[in-house]
Amino acid sequence: MAREFSRTRRIAQQLQQELAQVLQRDMKDPRIGFVTVNDVDVSRDLSYAKVYVTFFEEDEKLVQEKVEALDAAAGYIRSLVAGRMKLRVMPELRFIYDSSLVEGMRMSNLVSRVISDDEAKQKQHGDQQDVSQSSDDKSEGED
């Protein structure tokens, strides 16, 4: 059973590499544009493969159109990849938009913004303390 898992994982990795090459080099559909294959999850019986993709665009409508274009071309993409891989059965491809990368970048930007705001507040607060300490030092020297 463990051997089946490792075989499906190896097939998924090879399928990911082949799909990335086919989508970059062989697809001429302008609706798809630049696409990145993040991961491939192959079913145990090798009948289906979920292909997780991301695009350069973040607009939901454009992303949905691109996924639909990939789904429409899935049979053609499958035949191109089948010619490159030595499998008895080529899995049926299902393209899924992977929003985790976009969400991760958004969260990273939020954290960076909070850190820079916090540093600015600390610097401003530190400058105010320096001014109040220097005025206290001057008033002590006058006594």
UniProtKB/Swiss-Prot annotation:
GO CC terms, sorted: cytosol
Superkingdom assignment: Bacteria
Subcellular location field: Cytoplasm
Gene3D superfamilies: 3.30.300.20
Biological processes annotated in GO: maturation of SSU-rRNA
Compositionally skewed regions (Basic and acidic residues) per UniProt: 116-128
Protein's UniProt keywords contain Mitochondrion: no
Keyword hit for Lyase: no
Main location: cytoplasm
Alphabetized GO MF terms: ribosomal small subunit binding
Alphabetical UniProt keywords: Cytoplasm, Ribosome biogenesis
Region: Disordered, residue numbers: 116-143
Family: Belongs to the RbfA family.
Role this protein plays: One of several proteins that assist in the late maturation steps of the functional core of the 30S ribosomal subunit. Associates with free 30S ribosomal subunits (but not with 30S subunits that are part of 70S ribosomes or polysomes). Required for efficient processing of 16S rRNA. May interact with the 5'-terminal helix region of 16S rRNA.
NCBIfam families with a match to the protein in the record: rbfA
Oligomer status and interactors: Monomer. Binds 30S ribosomal subunits, but not 50S ribosomal subunits or 70S ribosomes.
Name under which the protein is recorded: Ribosome-binding factor A
Taxonomic lineage from the root: Bacteria, Pseudomonadati, Pseudomonadota, Gammaproteobacteria, Alteromonadales
